Swiss-Prot record:
Protein name: ATP-dependent RNA helicase DBP8
EC category name: hydrolase
Residue ranges of domain Helicase C-terminal in the record: 348-498
Any one GO BP annotation for this protein: rRNA processing
Domain Helicase ATP-binding: 137-316
Membrane-spanning ranges: none
Native source organism of the sequence: Coccidioides immitis (strain RS)
Record's compositionally biased regions (Basic and acidic residues): 1-21
Chain segments carrying region Disordered: 1-91
Record's function text: ATP-binding RNA helicase involved in 40S ribosomal subunit biogenesis and is required for the normal formation of 18S rRNAs through pre-rRNA processing at A0, A1 and A2 sites. Required for vegetative growth.
Domain notes: The Q motif is unique to and characteristic of the DEAD box family of RNA helicases and controls ATP binding and hydrolysis.
């Protein structure tokens, strides 16, 4: 193509036309002020006589833009290849039914659960049933009463929640099921699990526990929720004091669950059995309902229920106790240790133990036998620089809930607790359990150490042993069928660190400050509060 010629006739036209930097440079002539451009510029009509057979029109390239708004294709190209391109999208609750239909050959489907329920469990990454779930779910779906025993962390909640939701979805009405559990924290956890599993459906669960106002709970009960999760004491209070309109729906309950049945049916001081009997009195008789009992430690009181007389038209009670390959009641992935300490310096030994290289980053639960000890340790460890919170029965319910939420969210690394945290709580991140006080009952030890090494994970339990605790340790070893080993860490001498580092003085000063704060009636943040009262 011939180069285009542009002539300048006026003085102002002697200026060279501005050329964009991205276009090729022009070649200028010296004779007639002629500029020869090697690239096709924007076409300009010079005269009426210009032939229509001029060079074809070539559009000018757009100017570079400063806008930060880019096309999606440009953004994808800039980011490069997607590393997760081969991975499936996250499963939402809306996809649960379709997921269940596509997974009819899965293990949960073979147990007889509805497709929507199988899909919902898959959305929660629960795809393979555990031994207790494989044993109990089919029998519960047949309508049999059930007594299920399995060690901690084996999935007992799903073992009764899944069949309850399956049968409820077939005939949803009123108060379909009641779940009784000994602690508020465990009741809250079960309540949240029911909501999560039933997300594709319109289940209405309600939580009835102490520490909260009774009026809103009574209103919630009167609206006929589908599932009631409660502690026996508070539900018994409603049965005794609330009107008949509030508890009327309880007389049509189809299914009843006693979770941690060994604790609910235990007799003696602090027994919950009277409250449990009050709750059961408001429900249909045992011949008209299905009763499910689950526990990690099957006691004689629980086993005795198997031999109770039953009508001829009722199926026999299904009883299963899931044993492991080594026939123990604690996970095989749990390492049990003991550490001998002088009774007068237990706090200093605990402080150094939690500060070693192996334990300094582990989320841990520290169990005490008394609420006053737990309160003191919370204040003392806080002064020694640990991120700590507490959980015991003297705290208001709002504080108990918030403290547990902080620990779950890793805002606090240590949780100082009494046995209210020993049962049922599922916090997978816990890697260490410390028994500051040796439990008096070996079954309590089983529940305490069961807060770690859950679902096949590894965990460690360390028990601080004084001179008077030897017989308790021997009883625990006989109960669990395994011996504890002496705790040790390479290159670490706790006694040496305490002596050389002068930690006894630091810990002693922190303890005096904590005791003074308690005497003044202040909380862990130094605020003056009223004396805490224990509520049901």
């Amino acid at each position: 193509m011939a180069p285009r010629i542009e002539r300048h006739t006026g003085p102002e036209e002697d200026r060279e036309e501005e050329i964009h930097s991205h276009q090729s440079p022009s070649v200028s002539g010296d004779d007639d002020g002629v500029e020869i451009s090697e690239r096709p510029p924007k076409r300009r009509r010079l005269s009426d006589s210009e032939s229509s057979e001029d060079d074809p029109f070539v559009p000018q390239q757009p100017l570079p833009t400063l806008s930060r708004i880019k096309k999606k294709s440009d953004l994808s190209a800039a980011k490069g290849p997607d590393r997760n391109a081969d991975q499936p999208d996250p499963v939402t609750a809306k996809d649960a039914f379709a997921m269940g239909l596509q997974s009819m050959d899965s293990s949960f489907s073979s147990l007889g659960l509805a497709p929507w329920l199988v899909g919902s469990l898959s959305a929660m990454a629960i795809r393979r049933p555990t031994a207790i779930q494989r044993a109990c779910i089919p029998e519960i779906l047949k309508g049999r009463d059930c007594i299920g025993g399995s060690r901690t962390g084996s999935g007992k909640t799903v073992a009764f929640a899944a069949p309850i939701l399956h049968r409820w979805s077939e005939d949803p009405f009123g108060i379909f099921a009641v779940v009784l559990t000994p602690t508020r924290e465990l009741a809250l956890q079960i309540f949240e699990q029911f909501k999560a599993i039933s997300a594709p459906q319109s289940l209405k669960p309600v939580l009835i526990t102490g520490g909260s106002e009774m009026r809103p709970q009574a209103i919630a009960l009167s609206t006929r929720p589908h599932v009631v999760i409660a502690t026996p004491g508070r539900l018994a209070d409603h049965i005794k004091t609330s009107g008949q309109d509030t508890i009327y729906g309880l007389n049509r309950v189809r299914m009843v669950v006693l979770d941690e049945a060994d604790r609910l049916l235990a007799s003696g001081p602090g027994s919950m059995l009277p409250d449990v009997e009050t709750c059961l009195s408001a429900l249909p008789p045992s011949t008209s309902r299905q009763t499910l009992l689950f526990t990690a430690t099957v006691t004689q009181e629980v086993r005795a229920l198997k031999s109770m007389p039953r009508p001829k038209d009722r199926l026999p009670i299904f009883v299963t106790e899931i044993s492991t390959e080594n026939n123990t009641t604690i996970p095989p992935t749990l390492k049990q240790c003991y550490l001998q300490v002088p009774m007068t310096h237990r706090e200093a030994f605990l402080h150094v133990l939690l500060s070693t290289d192996a334990n300094s980053s582990k989320p841990a639960i520290i169990f005490c036998n008394r609420t006053k000890t737990a309160d003191l340790l919370d204040r003392l460890l806080r002064r020694l620089g640990h991120r700590v919170t507490s959980l015991h029965s003297l705290l208001p319910q709002s504080e108990r809930t918030s403290n547990l939420a902080r620990f779950r969210a890793s805002a606090a690394r240590l949780l100082v607790a009494t046995d209210v945290a020993a049962r049922g709580l599922d916090i997978p991140s816990v890697g260490l359990v410390v028994n500051f006080d040796v439990p008096r009952n070996p079954d309590d030890y089983i529940h305490r150490v069961g807060r770690t090494a859950r679902a096949g994970r590894e965990g460690e339990a360390i028990t601080l042993v004084g001179q008077r605790d030897v017989q308790l340790v021997l009883a625990i070893e006989e109960r669990v069928g395994r011996q504890m080993v002496a705790w040790e860490e390479e290159g670490v001498s706790i006694e040496g660190r305490i002596v050389r580092g002068g930690l006894l003085k630091d810990v002693g000063g922190a303890k005096r400050e904590a005791l003074g704060e308690i005497e003044e009636g202040r909380d862990v943040l130094g605020r003056r509060v009223r004396k805490l009262k224990k509520t049901r």
